[in-house]
Amino acid sequence: MHVTGTMKTLVLVLLCAAGTTGAFGQDQAATFKGGVDLVALNVVVVDPQQQFVGGLTAGNFAVYEDGVLQDVSFFAAAELPLDLAILLDTSASMYDKIATAQKAAVGFVSALRPVDRLLVIDIKDSARVLSPLSHDLDAARSAILGTSAAGSTAIYNGLYLTLKEMARQKQPGQNLRRQALVLLSDGDDTTSLVSYDDVMELARQAGISIYTIKLRSSQFESDMARRNAQASKSEYAMKELAQETGGRSFHALQVNDLSGVYKSIGHELASQYAIGYMPTNQRRDGAYRRVNVRIVDRANAQPRTRAGYLAPRK
């Protein structure tokens, strides 16, 4: 699941009568109410064959912040409601790939449940909200299919706007929800006003899992020699952003590849564990805190979550 980066909470109220260690897909709700800082993590656990590991309990997780063991105060193994942001590159460089990108995005919409919400943003010379975060999946689907390719590419502007918009939707006292962002693009930024560092800083604050899908075509491959330096830089940026936030980075060559990619992301989001802890370090200094999760009593189980977070400032 995805919760928040750092959320202010004094009381975690579980509104589900069943225990928090139930199987995936179990309905569960939680409410946050203001006070001290809770650090919330989405954790995916896989075996050596990259299959998701289910059936874990809070006792199987050891959470460290800057090397110091933390007390886990919240744990859920249930599939919680999802807030999903789809960021769609519709610049001119996507002309030969826009239909593929649209099909992949609509696939995400079809996989969502009534309890989930979807935000759609496209990027050309600037970023704009095509469909606000809501349960209206039909409107989101229509917005996606109505896009066309033109203009330059402001990927970092789009990521920044999306992270800001998702953060704005977090309200004190609301039910606990997962949050994730999926970027479909050819990966080359050309006109953003904000920098990659700006996006990374905001991502570390927001705690939203970011998944990047880099689309390619035969034209892209033939241009690789000329664009090698730029392509390598943008590819590294997308991979680093996904890794830092606990998401994943994918490369898709054909529409059939994309179908498997979005199914893989959906399965992963449904298989996440939600973990929350009150950090022993209560300083509000804006410093970066490194987070490490280890699995106890499960040989070869490999956890993946965000690498850390930025502490709030006073």
Annotate each language-model stretch with its function.
Residues M1-M7:
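N-terminal secretory signal peptides that target proteins for export/translocation
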Residues V3, A23-F24:
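Short, aromatic- and cysteine-enriched interfacial helices/patches
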Residues T4, L12-L14, V45:
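N-terminal non-cleavable signal-anchor helices
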Residues K8-T20:
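Bacterial N-terminal signal peptides
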Residues F24-K314:
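Scaffold/interface architecture of coatomer-like assemblies
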